A protein has these predicted regions:
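Cleft-lining beta-strand/loop regions that shape enzyme active-site pockets
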Residues: 23-37, 41, 45-53, 57-58, ...
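Extended, small/polar residue-biased N-terminal targeting/export presequences
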Residues: 52-113, 157-189, 524-534, 542-549
C-alpha cells in the first residue's frame, strides 16, 4: 500500500487517516438518495458539456461544482490538488528534495529570506536579502511563488540555476545548485533562556514527522548541558501537524497510561482514544506552554492535554480553536479529498472548536456563545471551558504595533536596509542599535522616499475632495490646519516608537550575521511571554497555586 495512504494527520494543515469502504451501516434511503442525485447531476453535467450554446471546459465545470458542494460544509473540507498533495507529503515525511532556500515576496520583489544551513544554496554562498532574477532560465517576474518553489524543488541530484541581484555588486550573480534531500526541522530552536538560567526553551514550528523525537533530543541535550529545572514549550503560531507527534510530545512529560486526546465522529470507526505509552523524559520539572491565536489543532491538543493534566501553566493568548478532525482520502490523478469526520476532545472531555458550522442557510457559521460553553474540571479540580480554544492560565495581551512600525514591516524596510548594511559591514557585534545606526536607517528611508498614511489622513483626504467640489473655502481652513497637525504627528512618530523600531532593526540585522537561531536567542531576553513564563517558573508558590497543586 502506498505510504501516503497510511499517514495520520491532525492540524490546521490536516489529518491523514485510512477510512474503511464507504458508509458503514448506512440507511437504505441514504443509498437511494445518493444514487438518485448523482444520476441527476451526471445527466446535467453531460447535457451542459455537449449541448450548451458556447463551448465549456468540462474540468472547470466539475471543479466549480465540487467546490460549491464542499463550500456548504466547513472550510477544512476541500479538494486538494497535486501541488497541495506535495505539501502534505512534506509534512508527512519532514523531507523533500530542493536546494535549501526559503524565498518570499518583499517590497514587490522575490527575495531570499534565509538559506538553510548545510545545503547547496548555503554552501555555494546564496545570502539572505539576495533578489531573485531568474530560476532555471525563467524570469521570476513571470512566476508565482508556488511556481518558483516548483522550480527549486524536484528530484535529488538534479541541477538548479539561480541568478540573483545582490546589493553592492553591480553584475547579477549566477549560482549552479544541486538538489538534495532536505530534512525539515520541526524544532527550530532549543536552548536555555540565557546562559546562566536553568530554564530551557523549545520552539516547535509544526508537528511534522519526528517532532517528538526532535523534542526528546532537545530535552536530553538541555539536561546534559546544564541543570534543567524548568521548561518553556513555545507553540505560538504553530498550525498543527501529525496527531501521533502531538501524542508523542505529551508522552515526554507524562507517565504511561494518561489520556491525551479522543476523537468522536458520526462513523464509529472514527472514534479513538490516545494515551501516553512511554516513560517520561521530563516528568517533574516546572513547565510553561506559550500559545497565541495562531496556535491550532495539534498544538491545541498538546496544550489542552498538559492543561487538563495540570502538568503545565498555559501563557499567552487564547488559541485558534480548531477542534475538527479531517481525513485525507487519495483520489484519482494525484488529487485528494480532505474531509471533516470527527471532533477531538481533551482529557477533561472538552471540545475546543470555536466556530459552529451549522449548515443552516439562515445562520451559517457562528462562534460558540459564552452562554453555551460548558465547564469541565482538570485533574486537580480547576475549572476549564470548552468551545473557544485553549484559554491561557496567564493572559498576556499582544503588543500593539504603532502605525509607523506597521508601515515599515509592510514595506519590508527593515529587510532591505539590513541587506545594505550587511554588504558594507563584514561584522556586527553590537548589543543594540546605536544612535548613528538609527540615524543611518532614517536617512535610508528618506532616500527611498518612504511614505505612509495614517487613517486620519485618508479620511481627511476624502473630506478635502468633497469640500473642493463645493468651493467651500471657509471650510478648508480648519481642514488645512488639521492636515498640518497630522503631518507633525507623523514626524514625531519616530521618537514615540523609537524603542520598538530599534529592537526590530537590531533583530533583522542580527539575523544576517548569526542566522535565525541567533535572532531567536536575542528575542528571548525581551519577549514578554517568555519573561512571564520565567517569572512563574521561578516562583514555586505561584506555580503550584495556578495548577492547584495539593501539597
Amino acid at each position: 500500500m502506498n505510504a501516503f495512504k497510511k499517514r495520520i494527520f491532525l492540524s490546521g494543515l490536516c489529518l491523514l487517516v485510512i477510512v474503511g469502504g464507504g458508509f458503514i451501516a448506512a440507511r437504505p434511503d441514504l443509498y437511494f438518495s445518493i444514487k438518485k442525485n448523482f444520476t441527476i447531476f451526471s445527466e446535467v453535467f453531460r447535457t451542459v458539456s455537449v449541448d450548451y450554446v458556447d463551448e465549456v471546459d468540462p474540468g472547470e465545470l466539475i471543479h466549480t461544482a465540487i467546490n460549491a458542494m464542499l463550500g456548504t460544509l466547513d472550510p477544512y473540507t476541500v479538494l486538494i490538488d497535486e501541488r497541495e498533495n506535495q505539501e502534505l507529503d512534506i509534512i508527512a515525511t519532514s523531507k523533500y528534495a530542493g536546494v535549501g532556500l526559503e524565498v518570499g515576496a518583499r517590497g514587490g520583489k522575490v527575495v531570499v529570506i534565509a538559506p538553510i544551513e548545510g545545503y547547496s544554496a548555503s554552501r555555494k554562498g546564496v545570502k539572505a536579502g539576495d533578489v531573485l532574477l531568474t530560476v532555471n532560465g525563467q524570469k521570476v517576474d513571470n512566476l508565482s511563488l508556488d511556481e518558483i518553489q516548483n522550480q527549486l524543488q524536484g528530484e535529488p541530484n538534479t541541477d538548479v540555476t539561480l541568478v540573483v541581484k545582490r546589493y553592492g555588486i553591480e553584475q547579477p550573480i549566477l549560482f549552479n545548485l544541486k538538489r538534495q534531500e532536505i530534512v525539515v526541522h520541526n524544532v527550530t530552536y532549543s536552548g536555555f533562556v540565557d546562559p546562566d538560567s536553568t530554564i530551557g526553551y523549545i520552539l516547535i514550528r509544526q508537528f511534522g514527522q519526528n517532532t517528538s523525537k526532535e523534542v526528546e533530543k532537545a530535552l536530553l541535550r538541555l539536561k546534559k548541558n546544564g541543570h534543567l529545572r524548568g521548561l518553556i514549550l513555545d507553540l505560538r503560531n504553530n498550525p498543527g501537524g501529525l496527531l501521533s507527534e502531538a501524542v508523542g510530545t505529551v508522552d515526554l512529560f507524562e507517565p504511561p497510561g494518561r489520556e491525551v486526546v479522543s476523537t468522536k465522529g458520526r462513523n464509529p470507526e472514527n472514534n479513538s482514544t490516545y494515551y501516553t505509552s512511554a516513560p517520561a523524559v521530563f516528568p517533574n520539572g516546572g513547565m510553561a506552554v506559550l500559545l497565541n491565536n495562531g496556535s491550532a489543532s495539534a498544538s491545541e491538543i498538546v496544550a489542552g492535554a498538559l492543561q487538563d493534566l495540570d502538568r503545565a501553566v498555559i501563557i499567552g493568548q487564547r488559541s485558534f480553536g480548531k477542534g475538527l478532525v479531517q481525513i485525507v482520502k487519495p483520489l484519482a490523478y494525484n488529487t485528494a479529498l480532505k474531509l471533516t469526520t470527527a471532533k477531538y476532545y481533551t482529557p477533561s472531555g472538552r471540545c475546543i472548536q470555536a466556530i459552529n458550522y451549522t449548515h443552516d442557510q439562515d445562520y451559517g457559521a457562528e462562534r460558540v456563545p459564552d452562554s453555551l460553553r460548558k465547564a469541565y474540571e482538570t485533574h486537580n479540580g480547576r475549572t476549564v471551558f470548552g468551545g473557544m480554544g485553549i484559554e491561557p492560565d496567564i493572559l498576556i495581551k499582544p503588543e500593539k504595533l504603532g502605525l509607523l512600525q506597521i508601515a515599515l514591516l509592510q514595506q519590508s524596510q527593515y529587510f532591505f536596509f539590513a541587506s545594505r548594511y550587511t554588504a558594507d559591514h563584514p561584522k556586527f557585534v553590537s548589543q543594540s542599535v546605536s544612535d548613528s545606526l538609527f540615524s543611518a536607517f532614517k536617512e535610508y528611508l528618506n532616500a527611498e522616499h518612504f511614505h505612509y498614511q495614517i487613517p486620519a489622513q485618508r479620511y481627511l483626504s476624502k473630506l478635502k475632495t468633497r469640500l473642493i467640489s463645493t468651493d467651500s473655502i471657509q471650510a478648508m481652513r480648519p481642514i488645512n490646519t488639521l492636515d498640518s497637525l497630522l503631518v507633525r504627528y507623523k514626524e514625531h512618530a519616530f521618537a514615540r516608537e523609537a524603542p520598538e523600531i530599534r529592537e526590530e532593526l537590531y533583530l533583522e540585522i542580527l539575523s544576517r550575521y548569526y542566522g535565525q537561531k541567533g535572532k531567536i536567542r536575542a528575542e528571548l531576553a525581551t519577549d514578554p511571554d517568555v519573561q512571564s513564563a520565567v517569572k512563574v517558573l521561578d516562583n514555586h508558590e505561584k506555580y503550584d497555586r495556578i495548577l492547584a497543586v495539593k501539597n
